[in-house]
Amino acid sequence: MDFWKDLIYFFSFQDTNITNVLFGTIMLGFTCGIVGVLVVLNKKALIVDAVSHSILPGICIGFMLSGVKSPVYLISGGIIAGIIAVYLVDWISKTSRIKKDAAIAITLSVMFSVGVIFLNIIQHSGNGNQSGLSDFLFGKAATIVRNDLYVFGTMSALVLTIIPLFYQHFKIALFDPEFSKTIGLNRQFIQGLISGLIIISTAIGIQTVGIILMSALIITPASSAFFWTKNFKKSILISVLFATLSSIAGVFISYLSPDMPTGPWIIVSLSSIAIFSAFFSPKGLFTKHIKASKNTKKMLSDNVLKNLYKIGEKEAETTKARTIEEILNYRFTPLNELKTGLRLLKTKGLAIKAGSLWMLTEKGISEAKRIIRIHRLWELYMQKFMQIQSDHVHESAETIEHIMTPQLEAELLKLMGKPVNDPHQQNIPYED
């Protein structure tokens, strides 16, 4: 009962601190969800990590120069440090034999080390305003105040302006780089724009989840979204949804248990969505396994169905019941697979069992004719239109017969007419 009371109170927005943290993290998640799609498509995931670690010295310098923990100075310093980091990565990789991933590692390590040194200097400086500056390492969403919301809101508005304005440019540059060169699209500008969005979103977001976890907030929702779709627009919407839901979940868990840090719980929530997507999305591992299992069973039942029909075709008695031994003698199939295939045919209503005998139903005969018809039509098509020798067409037809749709079969018949025999002079069965 307390849970429901807490839930109602949480979403009643009566507590100013909860409201600030909730809306701040939602706006941050919204922004990072969009930027993350651009990052993943542009294969700049490692750059995000480099930028997030490199921002620390910029924040420290911003504090040293201003003497106060003002978001304007800290974020400005962080953005400048992020720009330097991106430039250093490009400069090192272009002017030396060092590859880009190594250049990223070098930049990340050096900049972060400098940041830690500056942070240590600040902590021993005696400046009372430095309290809480170390929270940028691991994040502390509870420190979000109303002024921070203005910063988050400005950033969200900036992203919402840039994405529609350059939507087609992003789409062409990310999905078809060669075409973008052909039409004269300034890819360097687009790359710079993406880098700019990475730097700004990272500089603003580290207060919430910290330098260590910031890259996860940008990369994870987008990576999860691509398990569900490859469409650019849909991936942005799904990524934003995942980031927003995770932000709400992280703040709510932190509200229920004040000892629980908000930022890490946002990332844990995102990771849970990512794991679920990796297994249960249309392209997930579990879903693929289910589809593969279904395809294997279909191919097995189709092959057993063909064999049953072909025995009858050979003897001109397709409705006659057959023993398992007869089926095995016609074409050897491991006994366990044959029994499984026959059970599948029975379940589908394509065959019936009478004692120890198996017989095709009318539906089974019709389906067997369709499979064999596709097989033999495809063999003829390959020989006639693709100029492939008749002794080289069987393997391809063995695959096509299981996957060709009725629409494609109709197109094939329209193209070829209604031929009587295949390349091996076997009769092509049609419905009566």
Regions found by a protein language model. Give the residues of each.
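Short amphipathic alpha-helical interface segments
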Residues: 293-333
